[in-house]
């Protein structure tokens, strides 16, 4: 998942940063149910502006990140994206429906993205996918 995350951040043109990926924990509010973060298939990409912090201080990050998120979801099959939660809008996108649906999520300033396990755990497959969608990084 590390390679997938690195490319996601790189291609966001600085509007997203890793707000949390691999951590051993249960799903919030569901004791005993392991989180997809703990399985190494989820990342939270934030657009929050953190003053005077390189890589975390882009102006209008949400507005700038939305077209990028749309592009990722348009290429979800290639990139292995299964789920995207947009906490600011309390909505989720799932690969089996291919559209946004209102949800009941706590407010937040990040996107939670889950990737299929095969893609998440294969840097080579992730590289091929990102190269196909965005081109090879020299």
Predicted regions and their residues:
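Extended, low-complexity, intrinsically disordered C-terminal regulatory tails
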Residues: 1-32, 83-95
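A general structural signal for well-ordered alpha-helical packing
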Residues: 1-5, 42, 69
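Short, conserved helix/loop micro-motifs enriched in His/Cys and acidic residues
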Residues: 26-60
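Feature targets compositionally biased, intrinsically disordered low-complexity regions
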Residues: 13, 19, 28-31, 39, ...
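Catalytic cores and adjacent binding grooves of peptidoglycan-active enzymes
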Residues: 49-138
